[in-house]
Design a protein with these regions (language model features):
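Nucleic-acid 5′ end/cap handling module spanning
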Residues: 2-298
Length: 298
């Protein structure tokens, strides 16, 4: 039996001369906290009032192809800040998945089964040198490989290990996953909800900075929609690098609901080629060199 559907207009709350955008956020978030929405909400989307979807100017026609819209912004509560990655399992010299062992001390002194097994993943995102930074510009000059100005083409879009820049972490693309037994007794990689996933699958991950290095990513959901596109030959590798990098920054510098509801206590951040300030590290005069190394040298 088919489930009936209901189609309604979506209500937008605007920032006006009499009502700030923070007041509009407060109305929506208060309704959500009171359970007044019939559907699950996990954040807010901010769109310009005078632009069509995908447009950059008021008279732009709508685009009939997939494109990143730089004028639309999404906010999620800190606990929902996640990144979609294409996972690749570490391999042995024979081409099999590498399986490591961890000794679980103090579990059961009477048991000999205190070794837990895990797999190591490389987390990849979509990367295009023309949009996200050149991997080896010096060699490109030697080879007379000049950059293209066609930034909307996805010809150079490929999966690359995730090296974030803000904050920089050379090990952010490494993820260890404990393998668990399925109903048939086999050892599988699973999300925290019990979904089985394998090599070359797109998975949504959350990040916990309090965990040990290498164990900070937790798989929470298999992205069957994106994985299906990948298997059909489309260039879907999870989040694009600039999206993953932005989400990474939000994970480490979350915008809270209180900031959105009041417009208060929003941290000021100075970001330029010479000095970068943030609440954890203080001033750094090497950001330009770090960004060059992270985006161009690797």
């Amino acid at each position: 039996q088919l489930t009936p559907i209901r189609v309604e207009n979506k209500k937008f709350y605007q920032g006006t001369q009499s009502q700030s955008i923070f007041n509009a956020c407060n109305v929506i978030l208060d309704k959500e906290s009171q359970g007044l929405f019939e559907y699950e909400t996990d954040g807010l989307i901010f769109t310009p009032s005078f632009l069509g979807v995908g447009a950059t100017k008021p008279d732009d026609p709508p685009k009939n192809y997939k494109v990143t819209w730089g004028n639309s912004f999404k906010w999620k509560p800190p606990q929902y800040n996640t990144i979609d990655f294409l996972v690749e399992t570490k391999k042995t010299t024979t081409g099999e998945d590498y399986v490591g062992n961890v000794f679980q001390g103090g579990i059961d002194t009477a048991s000999t089964q205190q070794l837990s097994e895990y797999k190591t993943l490389t987390l990849r995102c979509g990367f295009d040198e023309r949009k996200h930074g050149y991997l080896n510009p010096c060699q490109d000059v030697i080879d007379d490989k000049l950059p293209s100005h066609d930034t909307e083409s996805n010809e150079g879009y490929n999966p690359m290990p995730f090296y974030p820049t803000n904050p920089y972490d050379k090990n952010a693309h490494i993820c260890n996953i404990m393998i668990q037994r399925d109903g048939a007794g086999g050892l599988q990689m699973m999300t925290e909800g019990g979904e089985i996933f394998v090599d070359n699958t797109i998975v949504e991950f959350k990040y916990n900075r309090d965990k040990e290095m290498g164990w900070r990513w937790t798989p929470i959901k298999v992205r069957y929609d994106k994985t299906a596109e990948l298997r059909q030959g489309f260039k879907n590798y999870g989040n694009a690098y600039h999206v993953a990098n932005s989400n990474w920054h939000s994970i480490h510098n979350p915008v809270t609901s209180s900031m959105l509801k009041t417009g208060s206590n929003i941290p000021e951040e100075l970001d330029n080629d010479d000095v970068y300030y943030n609440k954890l590290d203080g001033p750094s005069k090497t950001k330009a060199m770090r960004d060059f190394h992270n985006l161009y040298v690797k």
